[in-house]
Amino acid sequence: MAKAIPRSGSRRSGRIGSRKSTRRIPKGVIHVQASFNNTIVTVTDVRGRVVSWSSAGTCGFKGTRRGTPFAAQTAAGNAIRTVVDQGMQRAEVMIKGPGLGRDAALRAIRRSGILLTFVRDVTPMPHNGCRPPKKRRV
């Protein structure tokens, strides 16, 4: 029987205490995507790199409760809490979608203490593009 050869290094590589250092981000962009089923809040820096994100689903809301205004408010609060700790003071807000969580997410962002430079609605509107799906008959 062949002898087992001892390995020179352990399986884990040398990343014991080298966590990625948190950047100071004074200005950022907050993207709110509010659909009828869920609300997703993404915080990026000015170059578009994602710093933090949250959604109603990751906050623990399941099923139809994800589309509620309270779920959107909770998701916005979770996403912004981490960037306030990283030093964000000013932000632009881009809101997309027709969902119920639009206003609730914006209210939560205003309450967080971040100074909003502008709020823009970037909901995509077709210039008579694709044919929409047929109406539901319930």
Swiss-Prot record:
Pfam families: Ribosomal_S11 (PF00411). One of its GO terms (molecular function) is structural constituent of ribosome. Gene3D superfamilies: Ribosomal protein S11. Keywords: Chloroplast, Plastid, Ribonucleoprotein, Ribosomal protein, RNA-binding, rRNA-binding. Residues 9-24 have a biased composition (Basic residues). GO terms for biological process: translation. It is found in: Plastid, Chloroplast. The keyword Chloroplast applies. GO terms for cellular component: chloroplast; ribonucleoprotein complex; ribosome. Its main location: plastid. Residues 1-24 are annotated as: Disordered. Belongs to the universal ribosomal protein uS11 family. Part of the 30S ribosomal subunit. This is Small ribosomal subunit protein uS11c. The lineage of its organism: Eukaryota, Viridiplantae, Streptophyta, Embryophyta, Tracheophyta. The gene is rps11.
